[in-house]
Each structure stands twice: as structure tokens, then as C-alpha cells.
Regions:
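A short SAM/SAH-binding and catalytic strip from SAM-dependent methyltransferases
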Residues: 105-120, 141
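Conserved catalytic/acceptor-binding region of the Class I
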Residues: 132-201
Length: 260
């Protein structure tokens, strides 16, 4: 599947993404703050701001923000959301191509840096940071994790029916390999050392409607034809309704922190 196509699928489902995707825990923000030590008016860059879920968390700090996004739709959404905040600037550009004389005290990316070529992205982040500056990259893992038992068995069966070529997700060993790969990518180019890694877990309760909305934000779902996508979502909705009406979805976020 074309990477550019997958990057831009999210611009089609902005409102669904903002409604249904899980946010990030305050503990993550607190850890980034304690690690970075940044203070008022620090220069902060967010790579791949999406709908601003992580932005909302970091805005509790009195910093100066540049938000980077690639699609016109998402840039417009962010400008409408933060247009009245004089400390927020929204920029339409790819991180690999982004040029500025500015140096940053913190660069962070929330479930987005995998879209950036690691051999370009991590050395570029190093160059864009002030000495002592922090890079914080973190990802939600629930969308790529294999869950089984209970309601998940039926959800997995429906996914195999409509998306037979798509993985059901990583098991514990697979998640560990993802972690190891990301550590290696952070160190690619010989700039950053080994990151500090922190993990956050909780459980979200989704009713049928919100779970279907979440499912609609996944790039695999968006590759389906309109007719097939609607049938898939409707079958999932009906399945959840007749099986208790809710999904207890484990959430898992991995945070990687490095300093220049």
C-alpha cells in the first residue's frame, strides 16, 4: 500500500479521529516535562499534530509551539482549533522538508514519527534541537496489538472476513520487536544515544458507536471500497450490540526520551 495514500487517509476522518482515538495520559506529559526541564516560552515543535490530541496535553505548558502537518484538511482543522492562541503556529510541511532557522528546546511526535524516514528524521531532529534539548516520540500500541478472548474473537473474525490480508496485530514478542526497532532507529545516524523508555497502560470502554468510529480511523478500513467499508462497520456494530454493547479496550503507550 502506498505510504502517501496511508498518510493522507487521516485527513478523510478528522472528526472521527478526534472523537474516537484515545488521548494521552497526563503522566506522560509530566515525564516529558521532568526529563526536558523546559520552562516558560520554550520553543516546541510537534511533528504530525493530527487533530491536536497530544497538543491539548502539552498546551498546559506556557510554551511557543510550531505544529507540523502535511494535509490541507488537518492544517485547516488545527488553525480553526488554535487560531486564537498567539503562541501556536501551524505549518503545512513534511518534517523531512521543513526548513527553519529556529532551534527547539523540545521536539515531540505522538503516534506519527513512523511516517518519517528514520535515517532522515532522527538526525534532522538532532540538528534542530538546542544543546540539551529533548526529543520525545511516543506511540499508541492498541491499534497494532493482537487481543483475543471474549468479544475480541468475534471482532478478529470480522476483520479477517473484510480485510483478509491485514494482520490481526502483534503478540507480546512482536511488540518487543517493535520497541527494539524503534530504539535502533532513534540511534540511527549516530546522533542520539539509547533512549529512556516509559510505558503507560489503562483500559477504555467503547460503546458500539464509538468503537465503529474508532475502526473507521484505521488506515486498513479506509482502503476498503465505500460499500464494503460500510458493511464491515455495520457488522461490527451489530456484533458489539448483541454481545454486551461495549468493548473494554486495553490501551498501551510507549514513550521514548532522548537528549541532545
Amino acid at each position: 500500500m502506498n505510504t502517501e495514500f496511508l498518510k493522507n487517509t487521516f485527513s478523510k476522518v478528522i472528526k472521527d479521529y478526534d472523537t474516537a482515538r484515545p488521548g494521552y495520559p497526563k503522566e506522560l506529559y509530566d515525564k516529558v516535562m521532568s526529563f526536558s526541564g523546559i520552562g516558560k516560552d520554550a520553543a516546541v515543535l510537534e511533528v504530525g499534530a493530527g487533530t491536536g490530541q497530544a497538543t491539548d496535553l502539552f498546551l498546559q505548558g506556557d510554551f511557543r509551539f510550531d505544529l507540523l502537518e502535511v494535509s490541507e484538511e488537518q492544517v485547516l482543522f488545527l488553525k480553526q482549533k488554535y487560531g486564537n492562541n498567539p503562541k501556536v503556529t501551524v505549518v503545512k510541511d513534511y518534517f523531512e522538508q521543513y526548513e527553519t532557522e529556529k532551534k527547539y528546546d523540545l521536539i515531540y511526535s505522538a503516534t506519527a514519527f513512523h511516517w518519517v524516514d528514520s535515517w532522515v528524521g532522527y538526525p534532522k531532529a538532532w540538528e534542530m534541537l538546542n544543546t540539551g534539548g529533548t526529543l520525545a516520540v511516543f506511540w499508541h500500541m492498541s491499534s497494532v496489538t493482537y487481543y483475543e478472548g471474549g468479544i475480541f474473537d468475534g471482532l478478529n473474525a470480522l476483520k479477517k472476513k473484510f480485510l483478509p490480508g491485514e494482520s490481526l496485530g502483534f503478540d507480546a514478542e512482536g511488540i518487543l520487536k517493535v520497541k527494539e526497532r524503534r530504539v535502533a532507529q532513534i540511534q540511527s545516524g549516530g546522533c542520539f544515544g539509547a533512549p529512556e523508555i516509559y510505558e503507560y497502560r489503562w483500559t477504555d470502554t467503547y460503546d458500539a458507536e464509538r468503537y465503529v468510529t474508532l475502526l473507521n480511523t484505521y488506515s486498513g478500513t479506509q482502503t476498503l471500497s465505500e460499500e464494503k467499508r460500510q458493511r464491515y462497520l455495520e457488522e461490527v456494530r451489530k456484533y458489539i450490540v448483541v454481545n454486551g454493547g461495549r468493548v473494554e479496550l486495553p490501551q498501551h503507550v510507549m514513550l521514548y526520551l532522548v537528549r541532545k
